[in-house]
Regions:
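Short, Lys/Arg-enriched N-terminal segments with co-localized hydrophobic residues
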Residues: 2-18
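Membrane-proximal intrinsically disordered regions of secretory-pathway and membrane-system proteins
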Residues: 24-25, 121-123, 152-155
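Short, contiguous alpha-helical
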Residues: 43-89, 136-167
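Alpha-helical membrane-targeting segments
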Residues: 18, 68-110, 114
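Long, hydrophobic N-terminal alpha-helical segment
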Residues: 18-53, 57
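Short helix/strand-capping connector loops at secondary-structure junctions
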Residues: 97-104, 132-145
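Active-site rim elements
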Residues: 21, 42-43, 105-110, 146-147
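Conserved, structured core segments of small domains
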Residues: 43, 119-126, 133-135
Length: 167
């Protein structure tokens, strides 16, 4: 009998920590359920984005992972990206107020219902397509990622922003 205990973004199985991954159907369902708990009046516990902007930001991140958007790598990412890459897929929380890729920083007003549905559909498509259809293009800051790193990173990114809004 295996004992499973949830620890932050991970599962603990007999001494092995397994990071949650958006390619796992149960982890995707958990994220979608949490997104459904948001409402237009959800307030951030940190950061400057409102809830609709956060949903649009997460959707823009999905576009990168799906190979629909190709932001250029900046000099800082080229310099230190590969060294800090584990931030994306280790079991430690993403630091609050960590700076983001400028091309997915959302400052204009967005419509909540539209952004929520758009993000949910992108997550579903990404999960259904599976790791084999994940982009082979580099992340604009962290550089080359395997599909497993993308899957863990997407889960962790979504989890970070959902916690930002209390769900």
């Amino acid at each position: 009998m295996q004992m499973r205990v949830n620890i932050n973004n991970s599962q603990y199985v007999k001494g092995i920590t397994l990071m949650k991954n958006i390619f796992n159907h149960l982890h995707t369902e958990e994220i979608l359920t949490r997104i459904d708990k948001l409402n237009p009046n959800s307030q951030p516990q940190w950061g400057r984005m409102d809830v609709a902007q956060m949903l649009a930001h997460c959707s823009a991140f999905q576009d990168i992972a799906m190979g629909n958007s190709f932001p250029p790598r900046g000099w800082l990412g080229r310099l230190i990206g590969r060294f800090v890459k584990p931030i994306l897929y280790n079991d430690k929380p993403i630091p609050r107020d960590m700076s983001t890729i400028p091309t997915i920083l959302i400052t204009e007003k967005k419509e909540f219902d539209t952004e929520r549905e758009k993000l949910k559909q992108k997550i579903i498509v990404f999960q259904n397509d599976g790791p084999e259809k994940c982009t082979t293009h580099s992340h604009p800051f962290f550089g080359k990622l395997s599909s497993e790193e993308w899957g863990k990173g997407i889960y962790k990114h979504l989890d970070h922003h959902l916690k930002q809004f209390g769900v």
